[in-house]
């Protein structure tokens, strides 16, 4: 489940034979993935991650009341300046509410000025809690490389209007950039 307001993630339990609301088992400001359950057991394994937290493997009871982290991948990044991710919102030039993600350098100081890179392609705010491996890409930038070198990276959602890709992009992107400059 993906709450629209926070972009957090969770697992829920539901009985389709009743009209009762699903019961939350685990939810929060992270991304849960890869849940597996073996036959004849009351345990699952799954991964939990965020932009700052490596997608470690967890072992839990079916009700998620007892959970153990099995791996500690975050140890490999302890010697690096690791940035943070923040969800932001603004209004486009054509009046639509938009969201995006701002990736800030480690030890971000709001009183200080930083260079900013704008990286965009359609809608990516849903990736707020995705862990990104620091590696070169051929079609996007390495957020960690730029964060560790003192850059802010802004990834705004773009809502395209059919037949008007350039104007749509401008209408979405420019107010988002102006909002960040004004902060």
Please annotate each region the language model reported.
Residues 11-26, 60-68:
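Surface-exposed loop/turn elements that mediate protein-protein interactions on large endomembrane-trafficking
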Residues 11, 31-32:
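Generic preference for hydrophobic/aromatic residues in regular secondary structure cores
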Residues 5:
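Alpha-helix-centered segments that form part of catalytic cores
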Residues 33-183:
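Serine-hydrolase catalytic core recognition
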Residues 8, 29, 82-84:
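Residues that act as N-cap/strand-start positions at coil-to-secondary-structure junctions
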